[in-house]
Curated annotation (Swiss-Prot):
Full protein name: Toll-like receptor 4
Localization of this protein: Cell membrane
Induction of the gene: Induced by lipopolysaccharide (LPS) exposure, where expression increases significantly at 3 and 6 hours post-exposure, and gradually decreases to control levels by 12 hours post-exposure. Also induced during the nucleus insertion operation used in pearl culturing, which involves the implantation of a round pearl bead and a piece of mantle tissue from a donor oyster. Expression is highest at 2 days post-insertion and gradually decreases to control levels at 5 days post-insertion, maintaining that level until the end of the experiment at 20 days.
Matches recorded under Pfam families: LRR_1, LRR_8, TIR
Length: 899
């Protein structure tokens, strides 16, 4: 963006913030803008090719804003024109061959990787404010002919100069550089010849980089006079310079040296360590980097006491010795390292276990220790690298430079270290003797096995080091360790517990082929905030923890990763006490169901269940997640699962659509359904598809149940009504059938001619027995010469009463019912009356069989409807209960019976 554009934009924004009406202050703004339009000519060209940005975000007035112009990688052949507000310009990676005319206000200039052919003598004369200049990898190279003496004379404020890959002279351009009296940092190609006396004029020089990292450095040997004229430097980088030797005294003049990097000089080897350490003991050294000073392939290397013993009285804070094929460290070396050491790195080596491991506790102020990437594979093409592995021999574990007195001191230090942990129990150490026999040496170590660590150690890297052990019960020495990275090893059994690690906050045990995680492994790791157990085989082990014992003490844990662990099922209580958990990552497992209890994890923010086999979440889990989402911005990642969108789990899709939880579905995430031609539907179309499910999955169960109930009720009412309506017929048919097919015999059987055995069956109540057995038997049976059936006399004992009644009525020509109040109140009397009715209807073809005798007057309210029906439709006779009436009564009674 052009500076004018930025300025106008600020004006408009300011006007919008302050205006109270449509045209307020418009005239004033126009008069304010017009004088600035002359800037347009200066940025017409550059605005098409450069990107401008403000250096300070707090700048509010465009005319006073300092700008940065990024014109890199624009294929420019000449520099654009810039106004004085531009103070930083990047013209790198273009095709500019003439040094441009730049604004006087310029502070920072990068014109690297351009084919600059010539510099005018006064090219930098007007850039008196310039503080930083980079001319890296100039295509044609800078020669004494085009970078002449005095060209930098006006750059009195320049503090940083980078000429790497550009200066092609055989020596350092001392005459050119000596004018830069304020120069603080110089980066230039390393030359065989050291720095001359003219460099002493640059008193401010503190940082010197002659490495070949981006430039070109070819120096065979560094000697005592190489840096004699730049003895004020504090930081020195001579890495990647093809060095083969560094002589004693090289750094002895640089008494203020704090940082030294001699890395990536593969032909140096550890032979030069003694020379370096001797020189550095008189300096202020704080950081020493000796990475890859051995070639890649070869036998393992060793560091001896004499290599580093002179460092013991220095102020060294950092020591880097990576990629040196380091296999072992002589006992006592670590004891000679200074107490000020805070960071040590020996990664990408081939360290084996040795007694030196016990000496790490002497590094009392060490905060960071990196021994990662042990036995790492390398590019086979490195076998062609030049090597200088010649190492002076040693006798009985000592260097030729090591005196007998030094050996005695080292052994005493070692013994003090071994006996530091005194205990009643003994720890056995096996040591091979010269005749290959094994002897047991007893040392007073406690059990469980002690692991000494530096007391102030905070971060330890053991990752990718081919450590092949079960983590059993260990007691860690006094420490302040907070982070342990032990991924990519073979800790196949996490048994534990690891005692005295209550302050540990981060633990990474990923990719360790671990198959077992005991329920007490984390018992003492109560301060953990982040645990990573990815790429293991813990699915079977975790599935057994039904009580949730594994993580029970991790009350402060915030981040838990268990990806790629072949987990098929997780117990409900597995996260029982993780009340502080914020992130749970279970991605890329074999989970089909997720029924873990989450209601106690109120601060949960992210759950990753991606790439499992989950079809839906249980209702209980959905309710718990919704409750958590009320107090936190919860995200649940369900991508890559076999989600179902059918009628059976319509509630799950509805929950996804309506919940406030973010699910992070991508554009191509789908769920399986039978309501789509493709068998899948995009999760992004969840709202629309939910309507499809509602339409296709509408339940008619309630309607069906309701109609079924109504139908059953109606059918029941109808059946009951029919049964009630024909109850006597059914009873009659039942007992007739029962008597016929169940072996019952009749009282008397009909004659072959169809005559009945009895002339009449007399139905009466027991209370009216006198009338029936005395009066009727005398006046009807005897005088009328008729045969009557009385139940007191003619029923066959042992048979059902109902069967006897049915048979008696069936074998009698008439049925005489003696009606009285007692008769109406008798169940069996009413039964006999109704069976008589059925007999006349169904067996006698409508013949008048039933005859009523009203023995006494009864209240109409007590007479059943069925009796009323008979009285209304059939003739009956009332008993007169007087002498004259009796004669007529008995005669009228005998007449219908005998008919």
């Amino acid at each position: 963006m052009c500076p004018l554009q930025i300025h106008v934009l600020h004006l408009i924004q300011g006007n919008q913030k302050n205006r109270k009406g449509k045209y307020v202050n418009m005239t004033r703004q126009l008069w304010y803008i017009l004088p600035l339009l002359f800037l347009l000519c200066h940025c017409v060209t550059s605005e098409r090719r450069c990107y401008f940005s403000k250096i300070s975000k707090t700048c509010s007035h465009a005319s006073k804003c300092l700008l940065k112009a990024d014109c890199s990688d624009r294929n420019l052949t000449e520099s654009p024109k810039f106004n004085e507000s531009v103070v930083q310009i990047d013209l790198s990676n273009n095709s500019i061959n003439v040094f441009p005319d730049l604004p006087r206000s310029l502070l920072v200039l990068d014109i690297s990787r351009n084919p600059l052919k010539q510099f005018q003598k006064n090219a930098f004369a007007r850039l008196q404010n310039l503080t930083t200049l980079s001319i890296v990898n100039n295509t044609y190279g800078l020669q004494p002919s085009n970078l002449t003496a005095g060209i930098f004379k006006g750059l009195t404020r320049l503090t940083y100069l980078d000429l790497r890959g550009s200066w092609n002279g055989t020596a350092y351009p001392e005459e050119v550089l000596s004018d830069l009296v304020s120069l603080n940092a110089l980066r230039i190609n390393g030359k065989q010849k050291g720095f001359g006396v003219l460099m002493r004029k640059i008193h401010a020089l503190k940082r010197l980089d002659i490495s070949g990292s981006e430039g070109d450095c070819k120096i065979d040997c560094l000697h005592a006079g190489y840096f004699q004229n730049v003895h004020g430097i504090q930081e020195l980088n001579v890495s990647n310079c093809h060095l083969t030797n560094i002589l004693e005294g090289t750094f002895s003049y640089i008494t203020n040296l704090t940082h030294l990097d001699i890395s990536y000089n593969e032909e140096l080897s550890f032979n030069i360590l003694r020379n370096i350490s001797k020189d550095l003991k008189n300096t202020k050294i704080e950081v020493l980097k000796i990475n890859k000073i051995h070639c890649t392939f070869g036998v393992g290397t060793q560091i001896y006491v004499s290599d580093l013993k002179d460092l013991q009285n220095t102020s060294l804070r950092e020591l880097h010795a990576n990629s040196n094929r380091l296999e072992t460290i002589q006992s006592g070396v670590l004891m000679y390292l200074p107490k000020t050491l805070q960071h040590a790195s020996v990664s990408d080596n081939k360290l084996t276990m040795g007694m030196y491991a016990l000496e790490t506790a002497n590094l009392v102020n060490l905060k960071t220790y990196d021994m990662s990437l042990q036995f790492k594979s390398h590019d086979p093409r490195d076998i062609f690298s030049n090597c200088n592995d010649t190492r002076n021999g040693y006798i009985r574990n000592r260097r030729p430079h090591e005196s007998e007195g030094e050996i005695s001191v080292r052994k005493k230090l070692l013994n003090d270290q071994i006996y530091r942990w005194k205990d009643d129990q003994a720890f056995e150490v096996y040591q091979n003797t010269s005749n290959n026999n094994q002897h047991k040496l007893m040392f007073p170590f406690p059990s469980p096995f002690p692991v000494p660590l530096p007391q102030r150690l905070e971060i330890a890297y053991f990752n990718t080091s081919t450590l092949h052990y079960p983590l059993l019960k260990y007691r860690i020495g006094n420490n302040k360790i907070k982070e342990i990275y032990a991924q990519d090893n073979v800790f196949y059994d996490l048994q534990g517990p690891l005692e005295n690690l209550e302050g540990l906050e981060i633990l990474d045990l990923s990719n360790n082929f671990c198959t077992n995680l005991s329920t007490f492994f984390f018992d003492y790791l109560t301060g953990l905030k982040s645990v990573k157990l990815n790429h293991n085989i813990l699915g079977f082990s975790l599935a057994k923890d039904e009580k949730g014992e594994t993580f029970k003490n991790l009350l402060k844990l915030k981040h838990l990763e268990i990806k790629y662990n072949r987990i098929q099922v997780l117990p409900k209580k597995i996260l029982r006490n993780l009340i502080s958990l914020e992130t749970l990552d279970l991605a890329d497992n074999w989970l089909r169901k997720f029924k873990v209890d989450l209601k106690h994890i109120k601060g949960l923010r992210h759950i990753d269940l991606s790439n499992n086999q989950i079809s839906e979440l249980p209702p209980g889990v959905m309710r718990e997640l919704d409750e958590i989402a009320k107090s936190s911005n919860l995200t649940v990642n369900l991508t890559g699962n076999s989600l179902l969108c059918n009628c059976e789990n319509e509630h799950f899709l509805r929950w996804i659509v309506t919940s406030t939880i973010r699910f992070g579905f991508h554009g191509n995430d789908t769920c399986q359904t039978r309501f789509s031609k493709t068998g899948r539907v995009l999760m992004s179309q969840g709202n629309e598809f939910l309507l499809v499910l509602e339409r296709n999955c509408r339940s008619y169960t309630a309607v069906i149940v309701l109609f079924s109930c109504v139908f059953v009720i109606l059918l029941t009412v109808i059946v009951c009504g029919v049964v009630y309506r024909y109850r006597w017929k059914l009873r009659y048919l039942y007992y007739m059938t029962k008597g016929r097919y169940k072996g019952y015999s009749s009282l008397k059987t009909k004659s072959e001619e169809g005559d009945y055995e009895f002339d009449a069956f007399i139905s009466y109540a027991d209370e009216d027995r006198q009338f029936a057995l005395h009066d009727m038997m005398k006046n009807v049976e005897r005088e009328g010469n008729l045969k009557l059936c009385f139940h007191n006399r003619d029923f066959i004992p042992g048979f059902d009463i109902a069967v006897n009644i049915t048979n008696a009525i069936n074998n009698s020509r008439k049925t005489i019912c003696v009606i009285s109040s007692n008769y109406l109140n008798s169940y069996w009397c009413m039964y006999e009356l109704n069976i008589g009715r059925m007999e006349s209807i169904y067996s006698r073809n409508g013949e008048d069989v039933l005859f009523l005798v009203i023995l006494e007057n009864c209240s109409s309210s007590n007479i059943p409807f069925s009796v009323f029906d008979i009285i209304e439709k059939k003739s009956y006779i009332e008993y007169p209960n007087d002498t004259e009436g009796d004669i007529i009564f008995w005669r009228k009674l005998r007449d219908p019976i005998s008919m």
